[in-house]
């Protein structure tokens, strides 16, 4: 059994690693505004995902797609649509590209919501890339994310508020009082662990939270 892994650019993996592990990457798009507003991001299109999954299927019997958390992006929604389209296409074209296409096992193409992003997503993808089938790869990815915890502070809460990732009241407190929350990415979205005044205090508390989570 052979496995090809697909992810998106939120995994932040380097080109040498991608080449070494033969990992297919679909880019998330950054959209620059002309009026001076901050850049925004856009999920990959269904067609971009179909094309990536098809390339992966051309060199492996099973495909595992591991994507950025659905709490941060709609990528996983398009990924599931793309997977359904490609599976339907292969059912009607048994002699299509890829090893033993006509004899592919059920669930030969699996889509996994990682529940995370950036480095934690990258580690999950790397863990999965060592597996020989999609089921084992998904289990390794999920075990990796279960061991990870993403904590962070940001300089401008307005961007998170405009995208709906935090509430606007929290963002206004930052602007008026200099309140900075220490944030955590969970499967349900971005959660505030604590709020402090000032960026320096927020960074100190972030380090303290990280040490606590790590068992230090």
Regions found by a protein language model. Name each.
Residues 23, 61, 179:
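Short glycine/serine/threonine/alanine-rich loop segments
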